[in-house]
Amino acid sequence: MRKLTILKPDDWHLHVRSGGELQSVIGMSSAQMGRAIIMPNLSPPITSVEQALIYREEILGALPNGHTFEPLMVLYLTDNTSVKEIELAANNEFIKAAKLYPSGATTNSDKGVTDVSKIYPVLESMQKNGMPLLVHGEITHKEVDIFDREAAFIDQVLEKTIKNFPSLKVVFEHITTKDAKDFVLSCKDNVAATITPHHLLANRNNMLVGGIQPHYY
């Protein structure tokens, strides 16, 4: 075999940032991918339909000449996200999901959700409108070991959330543990997960033995 032809793939979790960073990286994605789910954790974050549409235009304007690429926009959930905003997003053709970042869990997550119960009305609206919830699944409590954060999130947050909203479409993003895999497989078909290739091939020993190897992070 000398040649393998595949359909142009999509990227289901993409950070392109904004400004100069966007200009630097977008071409590498648009050269290979047809569409991408665009992460909304900018500073400030993309919390409204209006902001998402402006950001979409910025991305399209940064594409290299001749590239065709469709950014699929996502809202960043906060404690103050309104049901009205979710309804607007659910009825907008360019916005495909909303993202749950536990406050303090990752880059630009300081304005994320402090307690998932605070957004239950929002989740109810998302369930009603068929809008997917993308989840960064990590507990940030200091007493939880950093390598147990994903499993603790399942036990303390995600399991209860799915029980309360059984028809909500949920994507547990970039999972890293057997706990997460087993949990998703135990759920109904409206709960799914994404996993990166390096998390299939490497573990924390690859990252830490002989000194920190950051590219295995």
Predicted segments with their positions:
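Divalent metal-dependent hydrolysis catalytic cores, especially in the metallo-beta-lactamase
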Residues: 11-12, 25-50, 66-78, 94-108, ...
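Short secondary-structure boundary/capping elements
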Residues: 17-21, 50-51, 81, 114, ...
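Short beta->alpha connector loops
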Residues: 18-21, 77-81, 174-179
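Short, acidic/polar
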Residues: 19-28, 80-92
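N-terminal cationic-hydrophobic initiation segments that often serve targeting/anchoring roles
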Residues: 30, 56, 60-63, 90, ...
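Glycine-rich loop at the start of a catalytic domain that most often binds anionic cofactors/ligands
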Residues: 49-57
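Histidine/acidic residue-rich metal-binding segments in metalloenzymes
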Residues: 85-100, 106-217
